[in-house]
């Protein structure tokens, strides 16, 4: 008797419904955004040190300047202990602050800035040049940040200059706080007088790199340190910064060391942010400028 043939019935696979596909796609997107957010948060709390070597025949021995900019009330550790420790380990001769350590939107909230300045001043003399957030808080919201920092024996500049001697080298520290658009009317006389006073090494502290888009390039500035541009906020591979205040898209001057005309200047990427757009691929930066004759 022949064996009976058996027929195998193959059931068609059920197609995944649109709803399930959508849920999976959304879950992947949420997971991706979550990972990206964690990476951004991690990056924005990692301090990066950027070293620059500047040569000058006006100095006797090596001078180290540590520069900070654009903290905008961000704290690295309790009472900025991580930031202070990093600066201390760098053994600076002076600490230069080039503005926007506060937030103009919180005109009376700057106790952390004063605390940081006091801690840094125990490491090395602090020289603080006002930025637009300090100026705007003072002019339009009656902030006492300038007076209160000055009361703590911190040298804070508002279109002022001071000569210091470091290891036998005389340095004229010039704090230019005027916005570049108002320079000709309110800042030029002060600046030119400070520049022509003597043949000392000229260290310019100003918040605005835009000064070097035409206004100050022909002056013999031995070194200027600026901030304001936040490194372009979002840094694109092979391109650089995406956007900076007062420069717009793809800013020319948002980070790094530059020589243009007779001037040498550094643009700090800064430490914090002032708006809702996060810093992306743009770690907070401590600038170290080593000035030497060799």
Protein language model features and the residues they cover:
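N-terminal membrane-anchoring alpha-helices
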Residues: 2-59
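Mobile, glycine- and charge-enriched loop segments
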Residues: 47-77, 186-209
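Beta-strand-turn-beta hairpins that frame and shape the catalytic cleft
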Residues: 53-66, 154, 161-174, 197-201, ...
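Membrane-embedded segments
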Residues: 62-157
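Active-site metal-binding loops of divalent metal-dependent hydrolases
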Residues: 68-73, 99-101, 132-134, 160-161, ...
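Short, Asp-centered acidic motifs that coordinate Mg2+ and/or phosphate
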Residues: 93-94, 127, 154-155, 171, ...
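Binuclear metal-dependent hydrolase catalytic cores centered on His/Asp/Glu-rich metal-binding motifs
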Residues: 138, 143-154, 166-206, 210-214, ...
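Conserved beta-sheet core of the metallophosphoesterase superfamily
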Residues: 209-287, 294
């Amino acid at each position: 008797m022949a064996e009976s043939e058996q027929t195998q019935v193959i059931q068609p696979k059920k197609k995944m419904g649109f709803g399930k596909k959508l849920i999976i796609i959304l879950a992947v997107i949420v997971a991706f955004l979550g990972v990206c957010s964690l990476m951004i948060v991690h990056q924005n709390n990692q301090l990066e040190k950027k070293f620059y070597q500047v040569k000058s025949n006006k100095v006797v021995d090596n001078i180290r300047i540590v520069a900070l900019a654009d903290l905008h009330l961000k704290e690295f550790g309790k009472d900025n202990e991580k930031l202070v420790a990093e600066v201390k380990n760098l053994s600076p001769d002076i600490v230069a602050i080039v503005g926007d350590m506060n937030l103009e939107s919180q005109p009376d909230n700057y106790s952390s800035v004063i605390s940081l300045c006091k801690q840094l001043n125990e490491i090395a003399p602090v020289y603080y040049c006002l930025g637009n957030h300090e100026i705007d808080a003072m002019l339009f919201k009656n902030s006492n940040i300038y007076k209160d920092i000055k009361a703590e024996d911190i040298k804070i500049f508002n279109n002022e200059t001071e000569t210091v001697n470091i290891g036998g080298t005389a340095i004229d520290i010039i704090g230019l706080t005027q916005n570049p658009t108002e320079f000709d009317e309110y800042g030029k006389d002060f600046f030119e007088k400070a520049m022509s006073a003597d043949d000392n090494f000229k260290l310019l502290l100003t918040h605005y790199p835009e000064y070097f888009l035409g206004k100050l390039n022909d002056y013999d500035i031995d070194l200027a340190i600026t901030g304001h541009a936040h490194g372009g906020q979002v840094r694109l591979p092979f391109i650089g910064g995406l956007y900076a205040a007062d420069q717009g898209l793809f800013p020319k001057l948002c980070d790094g060391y530059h020589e243009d005309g007779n001037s040498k200047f550094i643009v700090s990427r800064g430490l914090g942010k002032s708006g809702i757009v996060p810093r992306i691929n743009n770690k907070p930066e401590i600038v170290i400028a080593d000035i030497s004759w060799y």
